[in-house]
Structure formats: C-alpha cells, structure tokens
Amino acid sequence: MQNSEGGADSPASVALRPSAAAPPVPASPQRVLVQAASSAPKGAQMQPVSLPRVQQVPQQVQPAQHVYPAQVQYVEGGDAVYTNGAIRTAYTYNPEPQMYAPSSAASYFEAPGGAQVTVAASSPPAVPSHSMVGITMDVGGSPIVSSTGAYLIHGGMDSTRHSLAHTSRSSPATLEMAIENLQKSEGITSHKSGLLNSHLQWLLDNYETAEGVSLPRSSLYNHYLRHCQEHKLDPVNAASFGKLIRSVFMGLRTRRLGTRGNSKYHYYGIRLKPDSPLNRLQEDTQYMAMRQQPMHQKPRYRPAQKTDSLGDSGSHSSLHSTPEQTMAAQSQHHQQYIDVSHVFPEFPAPDLGSVLLQDGVTLHDVKALQLVYRRHCEATVDVVMNLQFHYIEKLWLSFWNSKASSSDGPTSLPASDEDPEGAVLPKDKLISLCQCDPILRWMRSCDHILYQALVEILIPDVLRPVPSTLTQAIRNFAKSLEGWLTNAMSDFPQQVIQTKVGVVSAFAQTLRRYTSLNHLAQAARAVLQNTSQINQMLSDLNRVDFANVQEQASWVCQCEESVVQRLEQDFKLTLQQQSSLDQWASWLDSVVTQVLKQHAGSPSFPKAARQFLLKWSFYSSMVIRDLTLRSAASFGSFHLIRLLYDEYMFYLVEHRVAEATGETPIAVMGEFNDLASLSLTLLDKDDMGDERRGSEAGPDAHSLGEPLVKRERSDPNHSLQGI
C-alpha cells in the first residue's frame, strides 16, 4: 500500500466492503468484474469471474497512516481508494452473521509482484451474497475498492497458505513449539513427535472454542484416553495433556464449578464439535468406568446394555439410524453440559438406637436393605448421567415391586458384596422395614443425598448457558417424578408414600426452579450486554425517589437506612460499569454475605435468611412500582432483571441455610414442603422470640405505632436494627 511512510514496499492490504445482501447471480449470464489497471504486459487477457455486484470506483491515492501486517484496521471517511502494491483478493462483506458452507470457503495465496492471481471458490452457480469469492486482478498497483467504514485485512508475514475462515487454532509454529516444550519437560524423544502431532490433530478435529460453555477437565482427558486406547497410542499424563490443550486453544481458562466442597475443575471456553464422532457414541462404558469413584464400588447399572439393544444397534446399523439412536446421540452431545464426573457421596448408617424391630425383621435384613438401596441409588445416578430419564420409572417399579417373596428363603437376600446387583429384597420384607421409623428416617436422609447429587449433576452451574432441548427434557423429567414414584409404591403404607413423595417433590421443584433461573439468566445476559439498554436503565433508575421508597418500606421491613442506601449506590455503580452477569452474581453473593454475617452460627440463621428474602422482594417491588408509575422506558428490562435477581437470591440463601444447618438444599426446601405436616411449633418459637425481644425493648415499644426506623431518627440512643 502506498502511503506517506511505507511507499510501495508496505504490506499488502485487502478491503472488506460492507454491502447489502445481493440477490443470487444466475448461472448463464456471467457478470464481468472490475478491470483493474495493472503493470502487466499489454495484450494480456484478463479472466472474467462471475460475482455479486461490485461497484467500480475511480482510482485515487490518499495518504494513509502506516498499517502493519496481520492486523485489522477500521478506516473512517468517505470513498477513499487506496493503491496496493501487491493486492491479493477483495471480498464482499455482509455484516449479518452467516454460517459459511465448506464449499464456499476460499483460500488465498502469496504471490510475487507482477503475477496474476485468480482465486475462485467452488460454490454453486447461485452464489449467495455472503459467499467469499475471488477477484481476478493484476497484483501490481491495482486499486482497492473502499467506502465509508471499510475493514482492511492485512496480509501475513510469511509466504505460507492462509485460510480465510477465522479459527482459534494455533499456528503450526506454535504447535511445534508446544511439542518441543513437552519433549524437554517430559523427556519425550524426538521420534515420538509424530504421536504428539496425532494427538494435536485429534484435539482440533473434535473440539472447538465457544464462549459461555465449559467442559469438565476429567471428561476431556477421558475422551483422550479412549482415543489413545482405540488407536493403540501411548497417552501423555494429565498434566502434559493440559499443557497440550492450552497450546492448541489459546486463552483457555480453568474454572472450578459445582457446590462448595464438591466442585470440579472445568475448561471454560471449549466444547465438543457438533459433528465430532464423540457425539455419536451410543454408550460410553469406558468413559463411565473412568469416572472418579472409590475403588471398592462395584460395576453400576448400565441401562442401555441391560434393558434394550440401543448399544448394539448403534454399532452395527449406523447407516439406518432410528429415533432412539438419534435421541442417544443428542444425549451424548448434552453430556458436556452436565457434571458426569460427580462423585456420589456415601450414605450414613441407620440409627436404630433402642428401637425394637418388628417381628420377622432382623439386623441382617437392615444391612441387606442398606446394600440394596445403595445399589439402587447408584443405578439411578448412572441413568441420570446418561440422560435416559425414562428408565427411572422402570428402576422404581423393579425395586419397589420385587417379585421375590420372603418364602424364597435367605438366598434372595445378598449375603455378601460379591453380587450386589443381582440381589433383591422381598416386597413384604421391604414394607416391614419401611414401617420402622428409624429406617424411614434413614431412607429420607439417603434420598436427600441422592437427589441433591442429581441436581448437581444435571445443573452444575445455574447461570451457564444450556441448550433449550436439555432444559426442556429436565423439566419434563421433573414433571413425571411424583407420578412415577406414587405408582411404583402403590402397595406401601400411606405414611411411607408421603415421606418418599415429599422428598421427590422437593427434588422436582428444585429442578423446575433451577431451569427457570437458567432461562432467566440467558435472557438477562442479552440485556446486560446491550449498552443502550443499560444507559436507559440507569437514566430511569436515577429518577426513582428512593427516599420515598424507604419511607414506605420502613414500616414493613424495619431495615437499617444506611444499609439500604449502600445497596442502592452499589446497584447503580454496578449498573453504570456495565458489569457482566457473572459480576452481578458476585455482587449479589456479597450482599447475602454482608447481611447474614451477623447471624452466622446462630440458631436464628434460617429465619433471618427467610426474612431477608421477604425484605429484598418487598423493596424490589417498591422500585418496580415507582418505575411503572413513571412509565419508564426500560421497565421491561428492569422487570426481567428483577425476576432473575430474586430467583438468584433465593438460590444463594437456600445454599447458605443448608451450609449453616449441615443439611442439603433439598432437605432445606423439603422442610416445609408438605403443608399438612407443617409444625406450628417452629412458628411459635419465632413468635416467642419476637415477644421476648419486644419486652426487652421497653414498655413504650408496643405503645408507639410507628416503625423502629422512624423512631430511631428522633432517638439517637436507639440502636440500629439490621436487615
């Protein structure tokens, strides 16, 4: 490009011109492109190429700033035309996002000056407006068509072939450097560099970068081990494999996802390609076998191998795929969004105490129940990890309606751990065991652990983008749970059914809440990334009379005014900074920590947490009310954000209460699930505590009919009451 500094030796530049979508070009009437002025010999025949319309602009030379290679420069101004000393190719550019078919992707090559370059894509006769097609031009001194807002893409430094399609893969030099580093750090000999190249190629063929998704680190390494085993390759260790991945996918980040105490490392920004063979596996038994689990655990339930022939049909009749195979392939694709490396916790032992067992029930029967129920729960975990939700109904029917009877003798009970999966418990014996209160309480606690593990497997991160097909499958699964269990336990006593259904109902409600929260998060993410919407929200929020909101809400909430003002300022500041959804989540988490800090370790922590949720929701409603009365332009955005933040606050408080009480979130939410069994003693205790605090406040506390927040302004000695 000629300019004031570089002259004719400056690097090559190619202009991408934004253009409206052009109609397809007919196959027969060819359209001749720009006849570019060149330094080629006279009489040389130029080859016409059919293209969408390209506007010819008179040649002009305008001084430009020095442009460096391998960069993208945005050029402001009018119809400026730049002269290029070594032009490669000019391409039409469509600002709308497009998916380029492989047949329309073209490549361009470096060539010496003065040579004629013709680059044409192997596209069909009707060329869409977004296709990348080549231009027949002389290389020497041809004008580049330019316009307002043109993007200049500059040529590379070397003389190697370049692909026009942008990818996040590393260059060959980077891959060679990664191999050299591995050879030095791991002592790998040079003759094994070919093996490393095959590993790198496997990574590039099966994985791609994608924003907003993550993949368990153990899952990716297990896929790699499977590949090495199938192709009889020597795998590198996990640490070296991690270095290899980071050299291929630049900027890859690592996150620790999951609940506190049971989180796993994930690679953030990478996923399986949709066309990867790993997505078409019907039953990844080796992958499941390599999950992190204690060595003493036996092989678990394999539904696709034991109940039907999905696994066999996938390997022998891949040319004729059935709907079941398509569903299995989709499940394999969805497994990257769940936590398949989750370790199933151990169950506690039943506390029988001094309770006398019923007639016909022995301690051997109790131990048999422990073993059989553990295996049943492990089978449930494996079915859910495979996303084969319809097998849950079959599992429950087979467990709670065993064909064996106590008259078959002790052989029907597992006498050892050698064959646990073949062991069954007679139905009448199972009913007798469940009628024992300590056994029923033990089974309830086991269910809390089981269903909490299933929640963490299916939804490891409530804010992470998840395909709508997976979300809908989880919601349909939650909708069917209560009916399946009630049908399977129809012959059991009503008390046993109520206990079991109460826990599974809390599990189903949690799945519905978390999927709704995830849906809100994806909708709000688009709002938080829109600068104009954020500015409008900030403008509307500054018009809200927060002093009036505090006056009205103080009588109900009795919150400390300084805390409310601080939250208001923090909210506006976070909004002004155009924070991401993850940053908002961190701020909400800090609010919960700040408010509940004074109640840490106190028996009143659960009640204080519930009161905070009520007050947060009330204040949010008052702000939304003010925005509604003012006909705020950003009311819709605020309404969406408010729904998301309320749900996420519920999620945070739920987990804080579970951590404080030593229970699982499922157990916390199932505490008041059955309104018929709601004990008023807890409410009485809360009321008694309130009365006791009221009596300590003095006799005039009941006589004054105004809120504490208002009275504190006139009474400087009155202590501030926190949220």
From Swiss-Prot:
Signal peptide: none annotated. This is DNA-binding protein RFX2. It comes from the Eukaryota. Transcription factor that acts as a key regulator of spermatogenesis. Acts by regulating expression of genes required for the haploid phase during spermiogenesis, such as genes required for cilium assembly and function. Recognizes and binds the X-box, a regulatory motif with DNA sequence 5'-GTNRCC(0-3N)RGYAAC-3' present on promoters. Probably activates transcription of the testis-specific histone gene H1-6. GO terms for cellular component: cytoplasm; nucleus. Residues 1-46, 292-332, 689-723 are annotated as: Disordered. The modification Phosphoserine is found at S28, S416. One of its GO terms (biological process) is cilium assembly. Homodimer; probably only forms homodimers in testis. Heterodimer; heterodimerizes with RFX1 and RFX3. GO terms for molecular function: DNA-binding transcription factor activity; DNA-binding transcription factor activity, RNA polymerase II-specific; RNA polymerase II cis-regulatory region sequence-specific DNA binding. The gene is RFX2.
